[in-house]
Swiss-Prot record:
Its EC number is 4.2.1.11. Binds a second Mg(2+) ion via substrate during catalysis. This is Enolase. Belongs to the enolase family. It is an enzyme of class 4 (lyase). Its main location: cytoplasm. Keywords: Cytoplasm, Glycolysis, Lyase, Magnesium, Metal-binding, Secreted. Pathway: Carbohydrate degradation; glycolysis; pyruvate from D-glyceraldehyde 3-phosphate: step 4/5. The lineage of its organism: Archaea, Methanobacteriati, Methanobacteriota, Methanomada group, Methanopyri. One of its GO terms (biological process) is glycolytic process. It comes from Methanopyrus kandleri (strain AV19 / DSM 6324 / JCM 9639 / NBRC 100938).
Amino acid sequence: MPRIVSVKAREVLDSRGEPTVEVEVELEDGTVGRAMVPSGASTGTYEALELRDGDDRYGGKGVRRAVRNVEEIIAPEIEGLDATAQPDIDRTMIELDGTENKSHLGANAILGVSLAVARAAAKSLGIPLYRYLGGPTARRLPVPFMNVINGGEHAGNELDFQEHMIVPHGFESFSEALRAGVETYHVLGELLEEEYGPIATNVGDEGGYAPPMKDTVEPLDVLVEAIEEAGYAPGKEIALALDAAASEFYDEDSGTYRAYGQKYTRDELIDVYKDLVSQYPIVSIEDPLHEEDFRGFAKITEELGDKVQIVGDDLFVTNPDRLRKGIEMGAANALLLKVNQIGTLTEAVEAGELALQHGYGVMVSHRSGDTEDPFIADLAVALGCGQIKTGAPARSSRTAKYNRLLRIEEDLAGAAEFGPRNDFFLP
């Protein structure tokens, strides 16, 4: 098997114009694998630590320390190792770091190497990345969850819920679903401009529009209208989904949620979600409650989990240990999988497989500060989870993933499948 001969890193820019880490891994046969690391805006407390320089460069957000850690600490330890021994390489880096949250070397340093190694190994073997990661049975293309109206930490408007998504699921192929989502997105832009003027079509971090809306139902109403205007059936063909990112509007002092000009207890907020689900074709709600509230997640899952997908993002942070706790308590029924939350490919895949084994849905996700690297597109197909969240069909950091999935579907030809692995939540 091809061995690693060199590991290099550099500071590059993400989609927000902030520094991130890019890693190149070269193998003895001349193959080079390259990977770029994404970065989040609303981050869970228990995420692996992204190492920043904290100096005058880039407002303190430079990543030269992480780059040095790759080249001076990690590289000497993994050069000479078999590139296909992904778990061993990731374990070596975890042990080198020696902390629970990868704060010594930086999760951005470790993850860059982890992903670049996988890509180099796949190229060396002459097989697509999704096939290398998922084996010969990897053929399921994911339903795209498109964040077309941005709020919260992703936009400069007054919407407290962070993401309002369209979910084109009622189609025979990924390419058909993508087309329906794109057409709806553009109709939505026209409707928003008519109602609010050109300012409404400014976009947020993830390519979605950021209109000057103020309440919970306004974005949902216009999404349903856009779906219909685009010629599709709300619910049956294109559903809706929310990412509340509730930790961002939770007040720890009072133990309440402050959203849309009101104060809610946990039970009152759950009632808000129940009302929305009864009125709109919503199939998935992400982070409806605070990231520490496992009992609250169990309660909302018990009350709504037979109707919609309750997704844990900040709750689980792609951490197998936190996921096990959630499974034991019945908290949520789906995992949002972000590779940079945990910091290695091996641990992320472990979390995804653990969720699927216990009947949880899995949605592979980008970050708000992403790059043109489409790694997660291959990962979603490899896991066969049938769900991906990678923003609106705008900005190259988002469309890169959609375009990669189109190529994968073409590569699979007649063998390609489309749709969620766990489809209980779809109407």
